[in-house]
Amino acid sequence: MANVQYYDVILKPVVTEKSMNAMAEKKYTFLVHPDANKTMIKEAVERMFEGTKVAKVNTMNCEGKNKRRGMVTGKTAKTKKAIVQLTADSKDIEIFAGL
């Protein structure tokens, strides 16, 4: 990954019921760049959100699903998700505050 900035690593937050329940344990779920590694994700979260300290990062690669439109078959894009756990003394992430 040449020349990728920290704001290119985190694409968007994942807003599902499961990810909202995990926020009680200070675990936040993000869609990340497919080439990003755990150290890049940790650095990006700590830079983007002031006062946060990352305890650990879990990542998962999600394969694209097979889709069909008429006779034509294709695949949706592959994605990568990261579950970021913050330390106990860390501030909460503000983008999830109103949800």
Swiss-Prot record:
Listed GO CC annotations: ribonucleoprotein complex; ribosome
Keyword terms of this UniProt record: Ribonucleoprotein, Ribosomal protein, RNA-binding, rRNA-binding
GO biological process annotation, one example: translation
InterPro entries: Nucleotide-bd_a/b_plait_sf (IPR012677), Ribosomal_uL23-like (IPR013025), Ribosomal_uL23/eL15/eS24_sf (IPR012678)
Domain of life: Bacteria
Keyword Mitochondrion on entry: no
SUPFAM superfamilies assigned: Ribosomal proteins S24e, L23 and L15e
Subunit structure: Part of the 50S ribosomal subunit. Contacts protein L29, and trigger factor when it is bound to the ribosome.
Name of the protein: Large ribosomal subunit protein uL23
Classification lineage: Bacteria, Bacillati, Bacillota, Clostridia, Lachnospirales
Gene: rplW
